[in-house]
Amino acid sequence: MTKRILFTGGGTVGHVTLNLILIPKFLKDGWEVHYIGDKKGIEYQEIQKSGYPVTFHAIKTGKLRRYFSWQNLIDVFKVATGLLQSLVIINKVKPQALFSKGGFVSVPPVIASRLMGVPVFVHESDLSMGLANKIALKFASTMYTTFESQVTNPIIKHIGAVTKVSKESGNYLPELSDIQNKFNPQLKTLLFIGGSAGAKVFNQLITNNPDLTKAFNVINITGDSQLNELSQNLYRVDYVTDLYQPLMQLADLVITRGGSNTLFELLAMQKLHLIVPLGKEASRGDQLENANYFEKQGYARQLSEELFNPETLISEVHYLLEHQDQFRKAMSESQEIKSPDVFYDLLKNDISLKAKGK
């Protein structure tokens, strides 16, 4: 009997990353892999770029809002359409399980899977759940959480952060020779990572303050190909895949938003980092919670976007560098990182138990 698994999740890179870690493991073990998402969403782009033999099923999707908006009336019909489409897909594919990484597009497949008797496994990365995963929790067989859950529920399993990077991930520096030739080896190297939604503020600061490259080598992942540049002490690139971890290793310090995936990658690498979280006006507040947690644990410092400017940036960078031993000690003592292989084995075992009715 062919083993089949459905994945869902999208809207941002963070809702796809873990799926892309797990998919090749299922493929290697002989599973047939399917993905439900929005063909206009980043999940479709990432699956296509991966080259994995995954069957992508597109559905309609609508945003779920906690506040009144006339757009809600339209999106209700989109979600309902997505639910019907998901029911048809699941009936056709007949998967043994659905794994959801969250995002608005995941809600219809999660509900449809439960209605069709397919076990639903959900992953939550943030300290508090978004609306999509709050809904998913009601239909899930198991929910895995990165942080200790604030909700008491027997189906919730705290597993820590699943990341494929580590402090011992290898030396990639020869691949960066062109960039290194432009950098001053006497200067510290800063890496700015804004994520799919938060790079603009970092881009503007670097564009408006060219003197920053007199004090530091600067790497800026911009999300905007028009800003691509390699010049003295400056490398700006819109998007990276294979170079992502090498650039992380090259950096002495990373300035990042508060997305949990990136934060836990930095923790796994024991990389100094300054968090500039998206505020509640640009997110549901999860990045603020993540940043507060990391600062409280002693892993990082945070700086609000309102106070983010060249002077405060340089001040925080100097503080982190001067106190790097204490931050690295806190990160080295963390027990929050779980390897993808360990999580994959746990997930496979849970799927097997559900198949046996346990």
Swiss-Prot record:
It comes from Streptococcus uberis (strain ATCC BAA-854 / 0140J). It is found in: Cell membrane. PANTHER family: UDP-N-ACETYLGLUCOSAMINE--N-ACETYLMURAMYL-(PENTAPEPTIDE) PYROPHOSPHORYL-UNDECAPRENOL N-ACETYLGLUCOSAMINE TRANSFERASE, UDP-N-ACETYLGLUCOSAMINE--N-ACETYLMURAMYL-(PENTAPEPTIDE) PYROPHOSPHORYL-UNDECAPRENOL N-ACETYLGLUCOSAMINE TRANSFERASE 1. Gene3D superfamilies: Glycogen Phosphorylase B. It catalyses: Mur2Ac(oyl-L-Ala-gamma-D-Glu-L-Lys-D-Ala-D-Ala)-di-trans,octa-cis-undecaprenyl diphosphate + UDP-N-acetyl-alpha-D-glucosamine = beta-D-GlcNAc-(1->4)-Mur2Ac(oyl-L-Ala-gamma-D-Glu-L-Lys-D-Ala-D-Ala)-di-trans,octa-cis-undecaprenyl diphosphate + UDP + H(+). This is UDP-N-acetylglucosamine--N-acetylmuramyl-(pentapeptide) pyrophosphoryl-undecaprenol N-acetylglucosamine transferase. Coiled coil: none annotated. The gene is murG. Its main location: membrane. GO terms for molecular function: undecaprenyldiphospho-muramoylpentapeptide beta-N-acetylglucosaminyltransferase activity. Its EC number is 2.4.1.227. One of its GO terms (biological process) is cell division. Cell wall formation. Catalyzes the transfer of a GlcNAc subunit on undecaprenyl-pyrophosphoryl-MurNAc-pentapeptide (lipid intermediate I) to form undecaprenyl-pyrophosphoryl-MurNAc-(pentapeptide)GlcNAc (lipid intermediate II). UDP-N-acetyl-alpha-D-glucosamine binds at residues 196, 287. Disulfide bonds: none annotated. Belongs to the glycosyltransferase 28 family. MurG subfamily. GO terms for cellular component: plasma membrane. Keywords: Cell cycle, Cell division, Cell membrane, Cell shape, Cell wall biogenesis/degradation, Glycosyltransferase, Membrane, Peptidoglycan synthesis, Transferase. It is a peripheral membrane protein. Pathway: Cell wall biogenesis; peptidoglycan biosynthesis.
